[in-house]
Amino acid sequence: MTTNIHQHRILILDFGSQYTQLIARRIREIGVYCELWAWDVTEEQIREFNPSGIILSGGPESTTAQGSPRAPEYVFNAGVPVLGVCYGMQTMSVQFGGKVEDSTEREFGYAQVEIKAESALFRGIQDSLNEQGKPSLDVWMSHGDKVTAIPEDFITIASTDTCPFAIIANEEKRFYGVQFHPEVTHTHQGQRILERFVLDVCQCEALWTPASIIEDTVVRLREQVGEDHVILGLSGGVDSSVTALLLHRAIGNRLTCVFVDNGLLRLNEATQVMEMFAGKFGLNIVHVPAEDRFLTALAGINDPEEKRKTIGRVFVEVFDEEASKQAQVKWLAQGTIYPDVIESAASATGKAHVIKSHHNVGGLPEEMKLGLVEPLKELFKDEVRKIGLELGLPYDMLNRHPFPGPGLGVRVLGEVKKEYCDLLRQADAIFIEELHKADLYNKVSQAFTVFLPVRSVGVMGDGRKYDWVVSLRAVETIDFMTAHWAHLPYDFLGRVSNRIINEVNGISRVVYDVSGKPPATIEWE
């Protein structure tokens, strides 16, 4: 009998904060399942979810504006604890008769809150004693409006010099509001506060662990597919790799993996994928060499968006052809993860603006008529990595820098040719190798090389050469929504440049990209 890892669950209502997914990840780290829903859910949906507690997120709106979002009334009638964060605290205050006003003194960044009263949520949690000898917390604020009068039956737990109601509580109903963001690392005791809310106030058990997730997923996969066969497109990336191992554990050789070698992979990647999954793990893999087909389809195409669509279209064609050979297959597996589900839901509202086609999302023909299996759809990326480790995948593989779905197709600028891909593969391998040797690889968030379709004059020995240019790119980021270019040491960059120019015949110049995001994107295309 497996543990019901969804037995205790937290519902997070999203009011639009940039940090909302971070709240969910923090709750999962505590070991408790949670889901993230839009703020305008119905009473029926909340009842069906049956949460042990509810968190109201922050958001960019103002409760003083007409028509601003409000928490559904049932949230406060469900008989479970509620934690309002920033905007969530403000809307809770207004809905219970308190007042919120636009503040002339906005708080963005570090603040110190002084704890003035006992609370079940904060008992024993503090960073230091302030000058008056009162316990205080170092927190991260990000708000313009502030509560100026708290509702009846609420008390003030803590305040700052400019925010008289930084923490409020109705202890009897177990309703709490914090004006700061406990989910960000800048709030030093933030994780302890969330743990106290989830484990003590909501009385959840920490059942959400990698081992229990694997056990639960295997049981559910067996229930879903029965004795049927499943097909999966295996890329060697984290998501498809973990999906493959979960399915293999659940149904064994009734899983067929199709590995499409499109000629746009990193150096020796196809060999590594086959050795790892067919060799070490014993998976049933169909290896499809399709470099010529992809490069032929890409010939003459310079537009980045058109390249992406072409790569996606050809992949679907190749995969469809292989799938049609597997007559016994009834299910298609995909490595969809929870942020993909959230993003798709947001796109369905019409509020999302497409900057680029998503690197890792594609469609398959409806005529395939296969059922869909998505073992990772409840998981964040960091959870997928932890499960991969538990399943025996190497740490280095699970923690490689992101690689786009179209591969080198979006790292060769302009038209994609075999010559360009071969040069880029060699140059990129040198860059990554040197990052590892200098212990810099894990200190940057993403690093790669871009092929520029321009020639530059160089000197080699006594002769001139007129060869291609590549750019090195390395960034530091927390969420990949914004990024700073990495300040790699000059001597390191010089060493990489020398190796590439001397070892890769056809490249005469190496440059380093010092663009941040925004205004640039991380990938060049």
Curated annotation (Swiss-Prot):
HAMAP family: GMP_synthase. GO terms for cellular component: cytosol. The gene is guaA. It catalyses: XMP + L-glutamine + ATP + H2O = GMP + L-glutamate + AMP + diphosphate + 2 H(+). Coiled coil: none annotated. Its EC number is 6.3.5.2. This is GMP synthase [glutamine-hydrolyzing]. Catalyzes the synthesis of GMP from XMP. It is an enzyme of class 6 (ligase). The keyword ATP-binding applies. It comes from Photorhabdus laumondii subsp. laumondii (strain DSM 15139 / CIP 105565 / TT01) (Photorhabdus luminescens subsp. laumondii). Homodimer. Pfam families: GATase, GMP_synt_C, NAD_synthase. Keywords: ATP-binding, Glutamine amidotransferase, GMP biosynthesis, Ligase, Nucleotide-binding, Purine biosynthesis. The keyword Oxidoreductase does not apply.
